[in-house]
Amino acid sequence: MMKRQFEDVTRIVIKIGTSSLVLPTGKINLEKIDQLAFVISSLMNKGKEVILVSSGAMGFGLDILKMEKRPTNLAKQQAVSSVGQVAMMSLYSQIFAHYQTNVSQILLTRDVVVFPESLANVTNAFESLISLGIVPIVNENDAVSVDEMDHATKFGDNDRLSAVVAGITKADLLIMLSDIDGLFDKNPTIYEDAQLRSHVAVVTQEIIASAGGAGSKFGTGGMLSKIQSAQMVFENKGQMVLMNGANPRDILRVLEGQPLGTWFKQIEEVTHD
């Protein structure tokens, strides 16, 4: 039995997806956001350093503009995300303030982390904010990101973005909150006998092949992008927990070593009972 030990974890990146922030009705899940702010603030009070990678701009924008479906037109998608990003950050700021925690916004595009000078600048920004006891809230800059062959500036989705941020900031742990319990050996929505994988030490071709499917109507991420994110984390000698975000307080249980979700950690670094 692999024993999870997170006592030495100081810097944590938490990624929350749109499906965890927006209710099936399209309305904002205020209770979930409040719980998340409480948990992060509690961790900060214990001396942890937390960076939040938050999707949700599109979901917030759809709610504000009273649009039932995600636009298919790119320009309209960018407009909706732009409106939603402001609303999302406003809400985060209000709720975190209730717990005496200050937040900041960092919007990234892929080219920022590709070029050395801009990468150094954004790294310094993260370090400065963290040193001030501020929670950086990161999202992709959807209003200006493009995905064209000659000038691709999109990360693809925030699963990959969270892995990039974990690498940039040299985080001790990436916690990815989703609408699933973790990585299963097969699709649990199809197979009743699907088993949750408690620990993954190597991302095999079998695991990659078993991952697939799209995200929700509000988001873009699927299981494959989470597996690819785990690969990126491994490349940076990091570790990741993929878990259900239904109850953000479960983050505290994970950090206590409870075996929730799927723990991605290379086997040579695993401590045995």
Curated annotation (Swiss-Prot):
It is found in: Cytoplasm. It is an enzyme of class 2 (transferase). GO terms for biological process: L-proline biosynthetic process. Its EC number is 2.7.2.11. The gene is proB. The keyword ATP-binding applies. Coiled coil: none annotated. It catalyses: L-glutamate + ATP = L-glutamyl 5-phosphate + ADP. InterPro entries: AceGlu_kinase-like_sf, Asp/Glu/Uridylate_kinase, G5K_ProB, Glu/AcGlu_kinase, Glu_5kinase, Glu_5kinase/COase_Synthase, Glutamate_5-kinase_CS. ATP binds at K15, S178, D179, T220, G221, G222, M223, L224, S225, K226. Substrate binds at S55, D142, N158. This is Glutamate 5-kinase. Keywords: Amino-acid biosynthesis, ATP-binding, Cytoplasm, Kinase, Nucleotide-binding, Proline biosynthesis, Transferase. Its main location: cytoplasm. Belongs to the glutamate 5-kinase family.
